[in-house]
């Protein structure tokens, strides 16, 4: 499961030099001719990764994907990131709220559903991912899962 950041970098004639991104693609220190920098529209970065964090996946399915669990790419707005961060911080501060605020989910690919050390490690990881993402004012965020 991934949180990706897409930044629009397409250059237009009407942009000032300060607004333009410079895209350079090299391999082994040499320019890659097969990728034309002028045609690059987006840079996509993996800013978060979860492995078997079923509670986090369930939150995205319920709150971002309208209950549809289909391994698609889903836009995540800033307020959704802030909400998930708030929920994670509440669960971290008071473990007794975990089952109510961020319930685990069962499934073939998810591992255990216990509220144990692994569950709370996922909470810490998520807090770190979201705090970093929310510090950055550029780009759009997308959640995707794959099995």
Which role does the model predict for each range below?
Residues 1-147:
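Acidic (Asp/Glu-rich) sequence patches and key acidic residues
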């Amino acid at each position: 499961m991934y949180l990706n950041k897409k930044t629009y970098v397409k250059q237009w004639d009407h942009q000032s030099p300060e607004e333009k991104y410079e895209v350079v693609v090299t391999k082994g220190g040499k320019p890659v001719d097969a990728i034309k920098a002028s045609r690059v529209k987006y840079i996509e970065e993996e800013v978060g990764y979860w492995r078997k964090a079923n509670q986090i996946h369930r939150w995205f399915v319920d709150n971002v994907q309208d209950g549809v669990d289909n391994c698609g790419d889903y836009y995540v707005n800033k307020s959704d990131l802030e909400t998930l961060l708030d929920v994670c911080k509440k669960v971290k501060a008071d473990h007794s709220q975990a089952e109510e605020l961020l319930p685990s989910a069962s499934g073939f690919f998810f591992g255990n559903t216990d509220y144990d050390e692994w569950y709370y490690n996922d909470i810490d990881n998520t807090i770190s991912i979201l705090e970093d993402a929310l510090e950055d004012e550029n780009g759009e965020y997308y959640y995707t899962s794959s099995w």
